[in-house]
From Swiss-Prot:
Keywords: Ribonucleoprotein, Ribosomal protein. The keyword Ribonucleoprotein applies. The gene is rplS. Disulfide bonds: none annotated. Belongs to the bacterial ribosomal protein bL19 family. Pfam families: Ribosomal_L19. This is Large ribosomal subunit protein bL19. One of its GO terms (biological process) is translation.
Amino acid sequence: MSKLNKSIIAEFESAQITRQVPQFSQGDTIVVNVKVKEGNRERLQAYEGVVIATKNAGLNSAFTVRKISHGYGVERVFQTHSPIIESIEIKRRGKVRAAKLYYLRGLEGKAARIKEDLAATAQEKLARKTVTAKAG
């Protein structure tokens, strides 16, 4: 592929990315609000779990979220810039050293817990306080 074609594709992809997505990484617990279409109605469904993998590839970026539902592990892959994602909320920052947390699939109960990154959580709280203080 020539440089011209690559630049055209990159320009097109950057135009398609319209929404700002919060910065999250593996180990973080997030809530993804997904638009679900049922018949002629559309509603929001919250999917809360731990991010076990991310793929950063511009418009084709994706992340995998794992949760335990009724005793069974459920994983769902979301396209980061998909129109079905209404919002992404970070509940808790996790402290992990691995890039992919696939080892969580073999763990259950307390063994599958992830240590909280207290430093990142404190920084976010401080940032929110300063924003509200400036606004008020």
